[in-house]
Every structure is written in C-alpha cells, then in structure tokens.
Amino acid sequence: MAEYKNYTLNFGPVHPAAHGVLRLILELDGENVVRADPHVGLLHRGTEKLAEFKPYNQSIGYMDRLDYVSMMCNEHAYVMAIEKLLQLEVPERAKYIRVMFAEMTRILNHLLWVAACGIDLGAMTVFLYAFRVREDLFDCYEAVSGARMHAAYFRPGGVARDLPTQMPQYQKTRFTSKRKAKKLNEPRQGSMLDFLDHFVVDFEKSLDEIDTLLTDNRLWKQRTVDIGTVTAERAKELGFTGPMLRGSGVAWDLRKTQPYEVYHKLEFDIPIGANGDCYDRYLVRMAEMRESNKLIKQCVDWLRANPGPVLSDNHKVAPPKRNAMKNNMEELIHHFKLFSEGYCTPEGEVYVGTEHPKGEFGVYIKSDGANKPYRLKMRAPGFAHISAMDELLSGHMLADTPAIISTIDVVFGDVDR
C-alpha cells in the first residue's frame, strides 16, 4: 500500500492574499494546515542603517516608507524619540495637530484593512466603499504637505506648517465632470477644520454602511468566527499588541496606559474582543475607527478655539520662518547650519513607543553626541504577529489562510525594514 505524505505548498510571495511579500511554506494534510513556516526579509531595505548615516531631520522621509499604510504614525514615534533625547518642548497646538493626524492615519489604515480583508474573502463592495472614504483623508494629507502619502509633516518640535485655511479643490477633467467636481467641492469651500467637521458626520454614515454589509452577514461570520483564535494569556506570551491583543480581550492601549501628547486630555474608549478570533479582531478595528472619529472631532473643536505656534522657537532644532530668515542674519545662520549639518543630540539612549494602528511601534535611538544616531532600532508590531503564524494557522483549512493573514494586518515595509 502506498505511503501517504503531507504536501508542501508555497503560499506567496506573489500571492494576492499575501499582503505584500509574505512567503509561507505550508505543510498540508489534505486541505488542513499542519505547519506554517513564514519567511520574511524579502522587502529588507536597510532603513535602520541608512538612518545612521544621515542627520536626524533627513530620516523623517524614511519613516513614512516603513509601514506605508500608516505613514504619519511612523513619523510620530521617530520625532518623539528625538524630542525626548533633546528634552524639547512642543507647542500645545502642534500636539493636537499630531494627534488629529495620527487618528486620521489610524482610520486610513483600518479602512484599507477592512477593504483588503473584504476582497480576500469575496466582499468586493466593501473595498469600493472604503476607498471612496480614504480619498477625503488623503486630501487632508495633501493640503498640509503636498503629498498624498509620504507627507514628512511631523518635525522635531512640532509640525512643518499650520493647518491650511483653504482645502484643495477638484477641477473638471476628462475623468471628472464639471457637475461631479462641483459636488465634491461642496464640503471643501472653507478651511481644513470646516472640512473635517463635515467629514466626521459623513464618516459615521460610511461606517454604518460597512457594518450593514459585514457585521451580521452570514457568509462573513462563517469565514471569521472561531478562526485564528488566540486566548488573552497566549496573546501576551506571543508579544501581540494593538488590535491583535485587544481582540483577545486585553485592554492594553498605550494612548490610555502610557499616555503621550494630549491623549490624557481627550475622551475615548478602548474596544476589546471576547473570543480572540478573526471576527473579534474585525469588530475591534471597526470600533476603533468610531473612537478615532470622536478624537478627530475633539481635536478640531480645540484647534478652532486655540490658535498658536505649531513649531518650537528653538532655532537650533527647528528652522526659523522664511521671512525672518531673509531679513535677519542670525536666522539665516540658523537656517544654513540646520539644513547643512543638522543638530547634535546629547549622548544617551531613548525608547519611545506609540499606539500605531497595527500595535506598538517603537523607536530606540542611541546617541554618541553627533548629528546622526549611533544606532537606530525600530520595533515593528507586525513582526511578533507574523512570528505566531504557525500557531494561528495550524489545524485550520487552507481556505482560512487568507482570513487569518488579513486579520493580522501585516505590512512588510516595517516588518522587514
């Protein structure tokens, strides 16, 4: 009688459900996964080493390209680490702007997650709905930085510039009719704060639409309930953070447990799951988007009532204003020194962790007193989640693999660095 052997299958790195360049070597018994061996490193670009050869300010652009779905959240941890090293005070208005954009980025991340997860499991409509909403937030990115993704907007000491008083307008093109452009421009007639007031109301309706499509959908629940279950205790042992940890019922969120910026002044809840399966992780992320929407509204109200500076007045670290630089020799010298040499930080080491959309994103900097880091290390939340892939997939069907990979919400820009 012939001997039965398990079958080995390469899943990725070019599979559309691999979410980047994930390569999984799956050992299958029929259609059941016996073992999963994740291979990482295919998107390694040497970001940490590159940053060690550039002045601090010139590495902000690298941060956007780590997790390229949560751009400003990467910048946030990096500039906070530099500020901690320099013991630099940040203006209150800049803190609120940072928090507001961090929450916008959280929504951008979770919308892409629900879109990709939906399309992996056959829910095409959600993909289209989510991308329609993301356009509004990309317009906000573009308004403050000129870039729709890699903004480099956060700076040590604050943000690059204040919020604009006029939003970008859509123009008639061969793809956009005059009538459609006029409709799109209706909420864009005022300032960014006016636009965001309009957005937070509309976004609740958009979330309700996605909720209606998925939350009680029989097929969606069959694909996600009791799939990829992780207990609270095991999630902590595996080093899970973010929605992966909260989906297992652990109320750990750095914005509450170790508050930074102005989170201690804002009101929001920490959504948690009960069973730790794919469905709970979906519910947690949906609830997080509603909480982020509340935080954006609170920031908009505060920013409207409190004008002020958005960048530190320490010109050893933050550039002087352009008109001052062109009329004053001292400011010109500061500007020249800052952009040619950068600034030196005191000797020492710091670690800053922030509540990234995917979990705890940490930046460790060791300084030897030079104008560039002696050592830069990033803690990517996705690395711990990918490491648990064998445990998450074992015992499930091959068809459950895309659902589990999706709910991990992994991006290889930060995993491989």
Curated annotation (Swiss-Prot):
| Keyword Transport part of the UniProt annotation | yes
Gene Ontology CC annotations of this record: plasma membrane
Where is the protein found, in the record's own terms?
Cell inner membrane
Bilayer topology annotation: Peripheral membrane protein
SUPFAM superfamilies from the UniProt entry:
HydB/Nqo4-like
Organism domain of life: Bacteria
| Catalysed reactions listed for this entry | a quinone + NADH + 5 H(+)(in) = a quinol + NAD(+) + 4 H(+)(out)
Listed EC numbers: 7.1.1.-
PROSITE patterns recorded: COMPLEX1_49K
Q: Which UniProt keywords apply?
A: Cell inner membrane, Cell membrane, Membrane, NAD, Quinone, Translocase, Transport, Ubiquinone
Q: Does the keyword Nucleotidyltransferase apply?
A: no
The protein's GO terms of the molecular function aspect are: NAD binding; NADH:ubiquinone reductase (non-electrogenic) activity; quinone binding
Q: Which InterPro entries match?
A: NADH_Q_OxRdtase_suD (IPR001135), NADH_UbQ_OxRdtase_49kDa_CS (IPR014029), NDH1_su_D/H (IPR022885), NiFe-Hase_large (IPR029014)
Q: Which NCBIfam families match?
A: NuoD, PRK06075.1
Q: Which PANTHER family does its entry note? A: NADH DEHYDROGENASE [UBIQUINONE] IRON-SULFUR PROTEIN 2, MITOCHONDRIAL, NADH-UBIQUINONE OXIDOREDUCTASE 49 KDA SUBUNIT
Q: How does it assemble?
A: NDH-1 is composed of 14 different subunits. Subunits NuoB, C, D, E, F, and G constitute the peripheral sector of the complex.
Family membership, please give it: Belongs to the complex I 49 kDa subunit family.
Give the protein's function.
NDH-1 shuttles electrons from NADH, via FMN and iron-sulfur (Fe-S) centers, to quinones in the respiratory chain. The immediate electron acceptor for the enzyme in this species is believed to be ubiquinone. Couples the redox reaction to proton translocation (for every two electrons transferred, four hydrogen ions are translocated across the cytoplasmic membrane), and thus conserves the redox energy in a proton gradient.
Put simply, this protein is called NADH-quinone oxidoreductase subunit D
Species this protein is from: Francisella tularensis subsp. novicida (strain U112)
